[in-house]
């Protein structure tokens, strides 16, 4: 059987743990936009590499920002 060839998967690192961010503020729209798709959906952990703890905080912050009309619910 032939050996599988391809790129070695790079371990994704949590952005918040790596940069020492402990509080995710819903008013920091530039940070939150990094974790939203072009369609306006929240990107999953397997795509972003965010840890479970910070993914929960991130989700709450994004939903709060949407409620305050800082982020759109859907893309234009």
Curated annotation (Swiss-Prot):
Alphabetized UniProt keyword annotations? Ribonucleoprotein, Ribosomal protein, RNA-binding, rRNA-binding
Q: Which residues form a coiled coil?
A: none
Molecular function GO terms recorded: small ribosomal subunit rRNA binding; structural constituent of ribosome
Q: Which domain of life is it from?
A: Bacteria
Q: Which InterPro entries match?
A: Ribosomal_bS18, Ribosomal_bS18_CS, Ribosomal_bS18_sf
Q: Does the keyword rRNA-binding apply?
A: yes
**GO biological process annotation, one example:** translation
Record's GO cellular component terms: cytosolic small ribosomal subunit
UniProt lists the family membership as follows:
Belongs to the bacterial ribosomal protein bS18 family.
Instruction: Please describe the quaternary structure of this protein.
Output: Part of the 30S ribosomal subunit. Forms a tight heterodimer with protein bS6.
- Described purpose of this protein according to its UniProt entry: Binds as a heterodimer with protein bS6 to the central domain of the 16S rRNA, where it helps stabilize the platform of the 30S subunit.
**In its UniProt entry, what is this protein called?**
Small ribosomal subunit protein bS18
Q: Which organism is it from?
A: Oceanobacillus iheyensis (strain DSM 14371 / CIP 107618 / JCM 11309 / KCTC 3954 / HTE831)
